[in-house]
């Protein structure tokens, strides 16, 4: 690969908490819902990076939303009331003019996020915080590699949609089955490889790593975004560096979840 100075730039944002309400709920696939949030609190919201994440505060069952206080020592919650569950989510699409924000939720299990999303109705309120920062990746790499499972699909889909027409991208996306494939529109030259688990366990099947190992990848300078189960992301990164001669600083490998751990999200 040709050595070039294309280091991604990290920027920080003022951390704010926002009270939003559900504007619409619509299925993207049988196992993924797109929930549009809106409200005047989105004034000043910024999310320039496809890998950004917001913190969503899910109230306990039967409880109203709770807005913590953000101070120098972090978040402080009111005493005597159940704390909300907090999870990280990708801002899928932000419309500053309409003051709306799309967030995609994977429906799996009975965790707080899936449970809330499955019952979400127009007018319900929810609290979000962030993003605290963004990683800005230049648009002039020779090509882009994106790989991940359903948890990474909002970030991958957003990146593909935001790439310019001059860009080239190859994506490997692991989903439960063919019904979980999504329509992703992009101006760039995009090649998407959908990998179906078809009953295999997520995060423990080798689908993504095996597919990337077997792929004939282009020459040139590449930026790689890998996200999903933590051990998978690390294994793909190791393969790209040791066997494909990718520059480590041109790889973002994020662990969005960890097998056997209910709430595991590496900072990014």
Residue ranges and their predicted role:
Residues 1-268:
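Extended, composition-driven regions rather than compact fold-specific motifs
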